[in-house]
Each structure stands twice: as C-alpha cells, then as structure tokens.
C-alpha cells in the first residue's frame, strides 16, 4: 500500500466508509434490521484497479448501504484476511468505530440490545465537560465497534439540527469515525498536514466514560478533526489510561481494516501513524 505526500493527498471530504466482512449477507441484514440502513443499489464486483490499489489478489464484492446522507459499503473478498481481534478493547490501536446519531436513545438501545455490548450498564450520559451526550458502544456480528450518539437538548450541532429519522430507522446518519491513536498530539499534526482542522479537545474521564468504554481508570483525549466540507468528521482517541496496545499491521482484507473513504485529487491509499487505512478517491 502506498502513502502519499500531503501535496498529493489533501483530505477534503469524507465520501463514505468501507467495512470488511466474512459474511456479506449477514452483515447487510444487521445494518438494515438493527439500524435501519437502506440498500443503495445492487451488489457489485469490486473493480480490478481498486483491488490492486488495496494490494489484494482475486475478486471481491460490495454492497452499499445508506443512512441519511452517509454511505457505508460492506466489502467481502475471495481471499479473506484475519478475523477481528478477540482480545482488543477501546484503547487498542486498531480500534475504530462509526458513530450513529439517533434521535431517541431509548428506542435505539432497545433495538440493538441483542448485539454484543462494549459499554456496561446501557447508554451513558457523559458530563458536560465531555460533551454531555448520551452514548452506547456495541459490536456488529463481525466485531466492528459502533457507537449510538444522542445529543442533549439544545446542544445538537448545527449539522444535525432539523434532522429526523426516516420511517423504520433509528439513525439520522453518521457523525464521525473515531480511531484510537498512540499519541494524540502527533496524530493531530499528521492529519493537519493532510488538510484537516482540529476542533476543541476534551479530556474524557470519570465513571461514565469508564462504563462507556468498559475500561477502568479511563483518561482519553478526544480531538475532532474536521475536513473543509464539515460532517462527517474524523475523531482521534488518545488513551492516556489505559495505554492502547498495537497489533500486527492491518491488511486491506482484514475484518478490522475499516477504511474511511475521502475525496481527494487522485486515487491513493494512506496509512496513518498507527496503521489505520484511508482510501482516497478522485
């Protein structure tokens, strides 16, 4: 996989997200039935030039799903990589979640209760110093982490004001993708070099954050990184306590190799300082 220089790979907007699965029909049903994603067109073969860009041989197929204005594509490759690591937690440096904004956390939680939880004790309301949101983390059948996010009354960001869920959906769309990083300051500088602007940093800690992450003594720096287009955005999670463990380098056909797809000048792949994979499309 290639890494482009900042001049070649300015990240101007998030075009979508790609999840890797070992069972495309099963994962499609989960996102449809649990979260109300809608199928976006027919299943398609992944183009040969994209497979080459990903460093993969053989063939692959893709199903695009939509929630609000955001698109998530589910990829399954003939030659599958590693399953999602069983021993990881929210601080692990391969951790990456999609944050789904909901209007009614109670109804959303009832819908996903059968999924594998990350959080303990159900949805958590974080203190005002951590944004004051209601949040709940869980996993899809392949192990990909997800977060339900409900903004408090009067504090919904402008991008989400006036948004309502379509019939049968619990989600309004995807607010961000969050990635765990070893050094939030270094990652901040790295992503700024690709055109992203940091937002207000918070230090999330306390019992609510501990229950949300199912980790003891949590202290995590949260840094939103905004593309010029606005939402959705990237979020950096720099865990001070506990320190996140690194895993083997991700390959594009590993189930944990979630890719944020960005609009850019030309097709390329980018690995960040911790090995998270980004795909750039022109």
Role assignments for model-derived ranges:
Residues 9, 20-70, 126-131, 137, ...:
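Core segments of cupin and vicinal oxygen chelate
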Residues 1-28, 34, 41, 95-100, ...:
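N-terminal beta-strand motif that seeds the catalytic metal site of vicinal oxygen chelate
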Residues 3, 48-51, 81-86, 155-162, ...:
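A short, acidic/glycine-rich surface segment
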Residues 74-76, 136-163:
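Short, structured interface segments
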Residues 119-127:
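Short, basic/aromatic recognition patches
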Residues 13-22, 59-79, 84-112, 134-139, ...:
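Vicinal oxygen chelate
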């Amino acid at each position: 996989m290639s890494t482009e220089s900042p001049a070649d790979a300015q990240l101007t907007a998030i075009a979508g997200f790609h999840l890797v699965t070992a069972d495309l029909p099963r994962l499609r049903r989960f996102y449809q039935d649990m979260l109300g994603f809608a199928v976006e067109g027919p299943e398609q073969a992944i183009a040969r030039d994209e497979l080459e860009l990903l460093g993969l041989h053989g063939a692959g197929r893709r199903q695009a799903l939509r929630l609000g204005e955001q698109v998530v594509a589910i990829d399954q490759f003939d030659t599958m990589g590693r399953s999602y690591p069983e021993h990881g937690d929210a601080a692990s440096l391969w951790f990456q979640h999609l944050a789904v904004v909901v209007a009614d956390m109670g109804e959303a939680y009832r819908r996903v209760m059968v999924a594998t939880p990350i959080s303990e004790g159900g949805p958590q309301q974080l203190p005002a110093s951590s944004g004051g949101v209601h949040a709940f983390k869980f996993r899809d059948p392949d192990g990909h982490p997800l977060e339900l996010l409900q903004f408090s009354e009067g504090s919904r960001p402008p991008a989400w004001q006036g948004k309502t869920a379509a019939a049968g959906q619990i989600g309004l769309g995807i607010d961000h993708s969050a990635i765990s990083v070893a050094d939030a300051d270094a990652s901040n500088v790295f992503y700024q070099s690709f055109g992203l602007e940091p937002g207000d940093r918070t230090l999330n800690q306390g019992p609510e954050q501990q229950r949300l992450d199912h980790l003891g003594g949590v202290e995590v720096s949260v840094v939103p990184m905004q593309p010029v287009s606005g939402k959705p955005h990237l979020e950096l999670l720099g865990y001070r306590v506990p320190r996140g463990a690194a895993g083997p380098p991700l390959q594009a056909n590993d189930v944990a190799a979630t890719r944020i797809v960005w609009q850019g000048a030309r097709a390329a792949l980018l690995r960040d300082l911790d090995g998270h994979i980004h795909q750039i499309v022109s």
